[in-house]
A protein has these predicted regions:
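Short glycine/threonine-rich turn/loop motifs
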Residues: 1-39, 101-177
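Post-cleavage N-terminal segment of exported redox proteins
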Residues: 39-42, 47-125, 133, 137-142
Length: 177
């Protein structure tokens, strides 16, 4: 849920390992982290904020101004400084030491339920699994493409996925892996 409990069309995408991605949001409408970072702040469903108002509030706090000045120079926080700070922060969030990662290195053992989840994830539909790894593969569990996730579209067809960015019929109901 977003601002004042408003319900959006999609769940939030993961914010880790963004340095390896080549598009952002489930529909790929942003090509870089920098293109992405300010959109949720200004979206009427997510944070419903006016960027100038956010900058005004940030600039009212002396500690924020001092921190931004140390990092970026000028004393006044600008939109460019804000997106740069958010981009820099997001690019530091890296996952590579989860329990699953540790199990691959034989540092820990998955419990039976976790191991069943692993089996389902990596086993094809034809062999009794969920087939997740057909799209979610490699070290980042993504092939960085757009695919139909196999779920039925919303009854009102309100979320056309990648099609809303490209306008191409072939992109209807495709989402980032």
């Amino acid at each position: 849920r977003g601002f004042e409990g408003r319900l959006g069309k999609r769940n939030s995408p993961p914010i880790f390992n963004l340095a390896w991605k080549n598009h952002f949001f489930w529909d790929g409408r942003a090509r870089t982290v920098r293109d992405q970072v300010l959109q949720p702040i200004q979206d009427h469903l997510e944070m419903a904020a006016n960027l100038n108002q956010v900058l005004y509030r940030l600039n009212r706090r002396k500690s924020y101004r001092e921190d931004f000045k140390k990092a970026y120079g000028p004393a006044e926080i600008t939109s460019e400084m804000l997106w740069l700070a958010l981009e820099n922060y997001l690019l530091t969030i890296v996952s590579g030491d989860s329990k699953f990662d540790q199990s691959l290195e034989k540092k820990v053992k998955l419990d039976p339920l976790e191991d069943e989840g692993r089996r389902l994830f990596f086993t094809s539909h034809e062999s009794g699994g969920a087939g997740c790894s057909e799209c979610h593969s490699g070290p980042h569990f993504s092939d960085f493409t757009f695919r139909n996730n196999g779920l039925r579209p919303a009854p009102d067809l309100s979320d056309l996925g990648r099609n809303q960015v490209t306008g191409k019929e072939k992109d209807k109901f495709l989402f980032s892996t």
